[in-house]
Structures are given as C-alpha cells and as structure tokens.
C-alpha cells in the first residue's frame, strides 16, 4: 500500500505578489574576451517603487553564473562598429506638422493637435510629429551624425518602449541593421508588421530583409 499526502501536491498560488518576486533577465552582451555572457537580473520592489538589479557572468560554454559588481569594462559598447571607426545613436527628429501652430503659422498660440489618421497615440506616448531615428557618426569628438532615415515618418527605436537593442552593426561594419514598422497614419495603428532593415553606409541604400514575413520581426 502506498500512502501519499495530498500536501505533497500543494503548489503556491501564482498571484500578482508572486509575479513581482520574479527576476527580469536582460542580456547585456558578450564579454570583451568572448568567453562569457554578461546579463542582469532586476527584481521589482513594491515598497521602494523601483527595481534592484544584480549583474552576472556565465561562460558561453556553460557553467555556473558568477555575480559581478561592475559591467562597464566587461562588455564592449555595441554601438561602436566592429572596426572601431563609427558609433551609433538615436534621437527624435521632427518629420510631421501635428501642432496647430505648425500647420497654421498665423495662429501662433494654437495648442491643438491635428491628426489625419489613427496613429495619434501609442500606448502612453502621443504622436507629436517627432520620430526616433538612427544616426551614425565617426567615432571621434564633434563628428557630424548622419540620419539613416532622412525625412521618414517612422520610428527606430520603436515607440513607446524600444531602445538601442533596436539597431546594431553588421559584423563587417559596412551596414546597420535596425527594426522599424514603416507604416503611416491609420495603417500604422492597425499593423504590428515590423521589419528588419539593412542600411549600407557606403551606398546609403536601405533593404528590407524580412519583407516576406508579415509579423513582428525584431531579431
């Protein structure tokens, strides 16, 4: 006879409070020597209203994670091209006239927003006519940054939560790969079809690498 206690099958209820205890893992990159993966684990604190992060390394070949205090010198800056000549960045660029005073210059005090499509707001971010664009520049002081998306009313990094994970150098330093949903107005609001684009820094040409994939392409 096998006697088993029902308590052995008891499981903790997955409550909102339990979810807050789970660590959020974020990969930071490969170490400069290529031997370790560097990542952080952020655990939210309801009482402190913030997340507390701990940093770790783990061998790429497998093994145990080791806690580290600083990661600044462990991971190469991914925004610097592999050949060291260029650096990537992003900034907002005004590409649309949304404010009433921009559309009607004679109404200098107008503070209304004028929209012609459904893309007036993305979650918690209003469309104010400015869009995130990717730039590159020579890796030296006071170098002029070049917009790889000139005059385009699209965002990369993606709004509202995209960051510098939305763009990266190709291994040969000749191209920039970036994530973007190149749709405008109501089409933008009704679609999640982001794509991966490749910008050639020599020819200035942009190629859609995932045109056949009608989905949320990010990697």
Predicted regions and their residues:
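Short active-site-adjacent helix-start/loop capping segments
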Residues: 46-48, 76-77, 96-97
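N-terminal, post-signal-peptide region of Sec/Tat-exported proteins
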Residues: 29-67
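Generic short N-terminal amphipathic or hydrophobic helices
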Residues: 1-2
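Predominantly five- to eight-bladed beta-propeller fold
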Residues: 92-140, 145, 149-151, 179-182, ...
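Conserved beta-propeller blade repeats
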Residues: 23-40, 70-90, 120-127, 133-134, ...
